[in-house]
Amino acid sequence: MAKVCYFTGRKTSSGNNRSHAMNSTKRTVKPNLQKVRVLIDGKPKKVWVSTRALKSGKIERV
């Protein structure tokens, strides 16, 4: 299973590192995902959730 937020869909994105000489190298920017037990259809399930979604208070932990 890929590391993608179950609720918000946040996932790894790509960008560039830039040096002082403006040379570029590829880099990845990863979201802060935590594995959390939540109720889905009345059953507890472990899913990856972004901390932004957790802080919003819309997610009920089990």
UniProtKB/Swiss-Prot annotation:
Q: Which Pfam families match?
A: Ribosomal_L28
The entry lists its GO molecular-function terms as: structural constituent of ribosome
Query: Where is there biased composition of kind Polar residues?
Result: 10-26
Q: Which GO terms describe its cellular component?
A: ribonucleoprotein complex; ribosome
- Which InterPro entries does its entry note? Bacterial_rp_bL28, Ribosomal_bL28, Ribosomal_bL28/bL31-like_sf, Ribosomal_bL28_bact-type, Ribosomal_bL28_sf
- Where on the tree of life does the source sit, at the highest rank? Bacteria
Q: What is this protein called?
A: Large ribosomal subunit protein bL28
- Record-linked SUPFAM superfamilies: L28p-like (SSF143800)
